[in-house]
Amino acid sequence: MNIKVGTAPDSWGVWFPENEKQTPWERCMNEMAESGYAGIELGPWGYLPNEYDSLKEELEKRNLELTATTLVGDLTSDRKTEELIALLDEMAVLQLRFDSAKYVVLIDDCYTDLFTGELVRPQFLNDAEWDKFITNILKIRDHAKA
């Protein structure tokens, strides 16, 4: 059996496209390769190079494959879901050029502020919010399949 293991920039503490406290993308990719990972997901849009030739070159230098792109947002919000769908379309232009990138990682937003810890969304969903959450996931899924 041949198993390949992948990782993501968030394993290196990367949550934002740009933040001076985060590991620089070059170091992140180097350490992923040095750790023996075979595949990576793109992480937050704009953190790794998002131009095909540049990303392809950086992946090949490190013998890594792109396996997925990532969407993060408030899945209980119709407005945020529409923004995620627009971002999915933008990312698809890049993703579809990599045969190995067959997945989209979908992550709901945190319910606390990542810098202050302040509660910014309900910690628990009520029935209506849960229904909206599922509806919006299915909406993104259906759009991705189209």
Question: What is each residue range found by the language model?
Answer:
Residues 1-100, 123-145:
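N-terminal pre-domain/capping segments
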Residues 110-126, 146:
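Active-site-proximal beta-alpha loop/turn segments in soluble metabolic enzymes
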